[in-house]
């Protein structure tokens, strides 16, 4: 309990001799002052005293988790490991997977949390923003006064390894040179594109050349092209000043927006193409993955590759844990329950392709 006691002004100090103090009668008790909030005492000379005798009656203060803290705790700790056997023979039902998916916090970023002037002009979707703690910052090789912003995040890979991927949106007309600057800056040697240019409306601009083109200070050339049933592979070179590098570009177009492919086989073949690419093993830079918004199909591809690596190395996969890790790095990764179910189906198919293991 906080008690208030009257006090004299500092301009009139109290002086009282010892004798006078002993002969004067005790002062009359004055009624207790009305409780006043601390905010209302600003500028006052009223002294504050804490009555420690009352502390035992005060309930202990309990820490209350904010929604943000709850979100982060869930994403950091949730998991549902499935053995190869369980994934193939006792998988969760579609209803169970939908319920599990809907419990995962999206971890989207609000515009108020992204204090970067002018970023809206470089966002394809105003509600899909890069999480600040993992966003890619451009070093501005172009010497422009556009700041360091690009709608892209570093994404962890298998076993939590840092910066294995960069998840980003499909380039816009005013961000194509930013995209190539990111590719150069991060020493990217592999780009995986998971959208068509138009799906009813524009999903991504044609950011690579037919033969040769210059984007900002970067010159891009097509060296070779290979058509596969489900995807197209292009070998590019990117040149900045006198230095030239090779980049492999894979366009996987058999995946409708907000939906899933007709079968899991093509996606697994795409993962195998990436896994077997010399660019994957020989270069330390991250793999750039994008669709249109950079969260749905992008998240599915990255989660599929991580899940395949878990199954191969451990004999089990934690799909819930994978999605939570992805959403910590970029909000909204894996957009729909249908995509979450398809991810389980795809990894069950992959588990069946691995060498046989004994039943539990």
UniProtKB/Swiss-Prot annotation:
Q: Print the keywords alphabetically.
A: Cytoplasm, Cytoskeleton, Hydrolase, Oxidation, Phosphoprotein, Protein phosphatase
* Residue numbers spanned by region Interaction with MAP kinases: 38-51
Main enzyme class: hydrolase
Give the activity regulation note.
Inhibited in cells after FCER1A triggering.
Identify the residues that bind substrate: 257, 291-297, 335
Main subcellular location of this protein, as a coarse class = cytoplasm
Q: Which GO terms describe its molecular function?
A: non-membrane spanning protein tyrosine phosphatase activity; protein tyrosine phosphatase activity
As stated in the Swiss-Prot or TrEMBL entry, residues carrying the post-translational modification Cysteine sulfenic acid (-SOH) are: 291
Q: How is it modified after translation?
A: Phosphorylated on serine residues in resting T-cells. Phosphorylation increases upon exposure to stimuli that increase intracellular cAMP levels. Phosphorylation leads to dissociation of bound MAP kinases. Oxidized at active site cysteine. Treatment with pervanadate (vanadate and H(2)O(2)) or with antigen enhanced oxidation of active site cysteine.
PANTHER family assigned to the protein according to its UniProt record, in alphabetical order: PROTEIN-TYROSINE-PHOSPHATASE
Q: What is this protein called?
A: Tyrosine-protein phosphatase non-receptor type 7
Protein's gene? PTPN7
